């Protein structure tokens, strides 16, 4: 296993509600990252076909036409579109954690597929609890989604979606899996809007999401790749976001790469800029903060506090045998 790894975090605008266009752009970004020598690349939450922000700003009845399009442009894990992405990853010889809206039957899930340098999906997970209004669109991941970390030639790579970073027990379970490089997949998150126009909470801002990702690095002593979406004015109407006070354009991005002590390892880019942030990391640097804090080792008290995990995958239908 290589100790020095070049990592990349995507900050980019999706090809909204367009599956084929989304796949084309995904492959383009993989090729661009490969040309820059990236070994591990992280994409935002539901990068394909974009995060439908209008569910937060419009009534369900005023949003139904977008959700119908959204369902038809979500990607199946075993599909020709995914095969194209897998081929691009194989050609690049990297590890990719891809966030997308997964269609399985007639249901959608907020998925992350872990694709290794051979182009194989070596792990697939779904957000275990979509947040608030998200539950009107996406279903929940089951026990297989508790596994967050894979072994790779570039280290142990993990990933969570958005507010899964605010699930302390899930974070702890990922730490116990030995994560070294963590992909923090986020949608676009914006600045605090004018309180005279809307009652909004700080925890739903890019700054708060940035800090939550940084805390993961500090608490888990892992490198963290923060991947986020952006929104430009040209796509406001397409997303049914005209006139709302929350989604300021261009904006939404807050991508960053953190070291295992929480230190930023690259320069930030503007919230509305397209970029692949990169950093060369040394996995041996993890030992430095681990010597101070190992929350699943010497800095734990399992005799007093411990985590109980149910790994059983429930089935919708079980056929009994006589």
From Swiss-Prot:
Lineage top rank: taxon: Eukaryota
Record: active site: 45 (proton acceptor), 127, 162 (nucleophile)
EC number: 3.5.5.1
GO MF: hydro-lyase activity; nitrilase activity
InterPro entries registered for this protein in UniProt: C-N_Hydrolase (IPR003010), C-N_Hydrolase_sf (IPR036526), Nitrilase/CN_hydratase_CS (IPR000132), Nitrilases_CHs (IPR044149)
SUPFAM superfamilies hit by this protein: Carbon-nitrogen hydrolase
Keywords on record: Hydrolase
Enzyme class, broadest EC rank: hydrolase
Temperature and activity: Optimum temperature is 30-35 degrees Celsius.
Domain annotation CN hydrolase: ranges: 5-283
CDD domains: nitrilases_CHs
Summary of pH dependence: Optimum pH is 6.5-8.5.
Keyword Hydrolase: yes
Catalytic activity from the UniProt record: a nitrile + 2 H2O = a carboxylate + NH4(+)
Summary of the function given for this chain in its UniProt record: Nitrilase that hydrolyzes preferentially 4-cyanopyridine.
Similarity comment text for this entry: Belongs to the carbon-nitrogen hydrolase superfamily. Nitrilase family.
Protein name: Nitrilase
